[in-house]
Design a protein with these regions (language model features):
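Structured loops at beta-to-helix junctions and adjacent beta-edge loops in soluble globular domains
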Residues: 63-65, 147, 192, 249
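Short acidic, glycine/proline-rich loop/turn micro-motifs
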Residues: 73-74, 154-160, 200-201
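Short amphipathic alpha-helical segments and their helix-coil junctions
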Residues: 31-39, 151-159, 219-230
Length: 255
C-alpha cells in the first residue's frame, strides 16, 4: 500500500528555497525539543563530586546554592547532544571491555548506578563502573572511568597523561577511589577519540593527598554556604580566561 493512500496529501512548493526553509525548520524544532527536555531535568541540590576539581570554588558554590545561570548561558542543543554522545560512548566502551573478558559492573543489585554520598548527602558522586576481574595479569577490583575527547585533547591525554591534561578528571578519580574504597588498585581511565575512535588507556594509582585536598575543598564550600558567605573570586578581572566561559560570570562580577 502506498503511503500516499494512508495520509491526506497536500500540495506544497518543491523549490530549492522551500526545502532549505524546511531544513532550518527541522533543525530549530529538534534543538528546541532537546533544550526543553533539559529544562525539565531536576537540578542538583548537592555538590557533584565530579565538579570538585574545578579551579574555581566560587563557581562550585554557586551551583550548590542553585544560583540561576546568567542569561543566554544555558546549555544549547549542540552542547546537550555532545553530553548525550558521551553517554553513548561510555555504553559502547563498556560493551567492548566486556567482550574482551572484563567483569565490568556499572550498577548495584538494585539496578542503580554505583555511587557514594557524604556530608549528610550534601556531596554525592556516581562512578562509571568497577572492574572486578579480567584477562590482565593485575589485581582487582579497580575503578573504571570513561571519557571522550576531540583529536587535539586526545593527543594531550596521550602525551601528558590525565593529571596534566585534565586536573578535574584527576581529582574526580582520586575522590571516587577514596569514597568507593577502591584505593588498593589503580583506576583504569579510558578516553575515546571522537574523531578516530581510537582509545587511550591509563592506569591511575590512588593519590591520597589529592583526595584529601579535594575533600577539604568540599568542606570549605559547605561551611561558607552555611554561614551565608561567598568564597573569593578566582581572579581580579572578569576577563580572566576561566571567567569568560563561566555560566555565572555576570552574577559573580556584579555582586
Amino acid at each position: 500500500v502506498a503511503f500516499s493512500t494512508l495520509i491526506q496529501t497536500q500540495s506544497y512548493p518543491k523549490t530549492k528555497s522551500h526545502f532549505k526553509m524546511l531544513e532550518q525548520d527541522i533543525s530549530d524544532i529538534i534543538d528546541k525539543a532537546i533544550v526543553d527536555r533539559n529544562k525539565e531535568v531536576k537540578k542538583r541540590t548537592y555538590i557533584g563530586a565530579s565538579s570538585l576539581g574545578d579551579s574555581c570554588s566560587r563557581k562550585i558554590q554557586y551551583r550548590y546554592m542553585g544560583q540561576p545561570v546568567d542569561d543566554n548561558r544555558d546549555f544549547d542543543a549542540k552542547t546537550l547532544r555532545i553530553f548525550q554522545f558521551g553517554h553513548e560512548i561510555e555504553f559502547s566502551v563498556a560493551g567492548w571491555l566486556r567482550q574482551a573478558g572484563f567483569d565490568l559492573r556499572v550498577e548495584d543489585k538494585n539496578g542503580e548506578q554505583f555511587g557514594f554520598s557524604i556530608a549528610e548527602g550534601e556531596v554525592k558522586g556516581h562512578i562509571d563502573g568497577v572492574i572486578c576481574n579480567g584477562p590482565l595479569d593485575t589485581a582487582y577490583p579497580m575503578l573504571w572511568e570513561c571519557k571522550s575527547a576531540n583529536e587535539k585533547k586526545f593527543k594531550e591525554f596521550q602525551t601528558k597523561g590525565v593529571a596534566v591534561a585534565n586536573p578535574v578528571y584527576a581529582a574526580q578519580v582520586a575522590l571516587y577511589q577514596a569514597y568507593m574504597q577502591l584505593t588498593d588498585n589503580p583506576c583504569l581511565f579510558t578516553v575515546l577519540n571522537k574523531n578516530t575512535s581510537e582509545i587511550y588507556y591509563e592506569f591511575i594509582p590512588f593519590n591520597k593527598a589529592l583526595a584529601q585536598e579535594i575533600s577539604d575543598k568540599a568542606v570549605v564550600i559547605l561551611e561558607a554556604t552555611k554561614a551565608n558567605e561567598m568564597l573569593p573570586r578566582i581572579a581580579q578581572s572578569r576577563d580572566y580566561f576561566a571567567c569568560k566561559y563561566c555560566e555565572f560570570q555576570d552574577s559573580c562580577w556584579s555582586s
